[in-house]
Amino acid sequence: MKLKNIKIEERMEHYNVNGLSIALFEEGQIRGTVNYGLLEVNSDRKVNDDSIFSACSISKFLTGIIAIKLLEEGHLDLDENVNERLVTWKVPENEYTKNKKVTLRNLLSHQSGIKDPEGSFLELNSDIGFPSMVELLEGKSHYCKVPIEVQFEPESEFHYSDAGYCILQQLIEDVTKKQFYQVVNEFIFEPLGMKNSQLNTTMSEVDRDNFSCGHNKNGELVDGKHPIYPYPAASGLWTTSLDLAELVLELMNAVKGKSKLGISESLAKEMITPQRGKSWTGLGVFLEGSEKELEITSLGWGVGFQCMMVAHPHLEKGAVIMTNAELGVHQLEGIIGEIYKSLLS
């Protein structure tokens, strides 16, 4: 993938985007990065290869990789009722779970029958602090005031769900007996050398010099500068375009039987296979096209940030695009979409 027929700095000015980072990869290797602009408006902090952005919901792709790794090691089962392994909290049984159960497969593919309550899963309120996953799932927190339960028969409908990934986080913590960020460090960040990546549960302990601030569609700083989402598995990842590219490459290499994490070729292929008749959703990723033209994507959109990862596993190419601007429109309708189209041209 190469950038063609686009003047990025001109487009950044058009969209009021302060900072942007792109990593390009091909044939199993990172081919280069390009960085533009500033980490914070009206500062002298320039975006570089070590600049850290909020990946927002691309965190779900990371969680998908962890789940598949734990599945490979026998800690999880793809089609087993998750209540068999959940300890701290369990999915409430009701009329919708009589015939089909909530499983790892349908949680990862947003088909568990769970729908996020309106107005839930917003950014951290520093006066209230971090909720526990149990408080969230029981509807006993500011961030989710309604208990999470199955509202449709599992695998009957698709509903994009942060709550589903909170259940996945609790499941991962229960089976490993470790905090989620510890599992991520041990199973993902350290083996892949993702030294500039971390989850928001550890944000208070870091030097934020390399961290980008979030900005609104007018290019102005958002409140708090670094919006945090207290749901690490759903939206807690802070990372660089380079580190995120390493994670995407891990999946692409695993599909060819060359995983650094020990993920089998068969399970890697299952991640990028349409699930339960829904052509657009795999396990932790979204899909477009088929066979050699298959495209996998993951999008992030939160307060002050938008980003995208795109990969063509069979053509062995892809890109990560990270910005510190929330434009108020879908990624493909703003500067990320223009860059994406440039890469495909």
Located regions from the model:
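Well-ordered alpha-helical segments within folded domains of soluble proteins
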Residues: 63-64, 164-169, 245-246
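Active-site helix/loop module of the DD-peptidase/beta-lactamase fold
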Residues: 5, 49, 54-58, 70-120, ...
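A generic structural signal for residues located within well-ordered alpha-helices
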Residues: 62, 99, 163, 180, ...
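A short glycine/serine-rich beta->alpha loop
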Residues: 48-53, 152-157, 233
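Catalytic nucleophile serine of serine hydrolases
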Residues: 57-58, 159-162
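Recognition helices and adjacent regulatory flanks at domain boundaries
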Residues: 125-134, 142-152, 157-160, 171-178, ...
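Acidic/His metal-coordination segments adjacent to aromatic residues that form catalytic metal sites
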Residues: 44, 150, 225-229
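Catalytic loop of the DD-peptidase/beta-lactamase superfamily, centered on the K-T-G motif
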Residues: 1-38, 50, 84, 119, ...
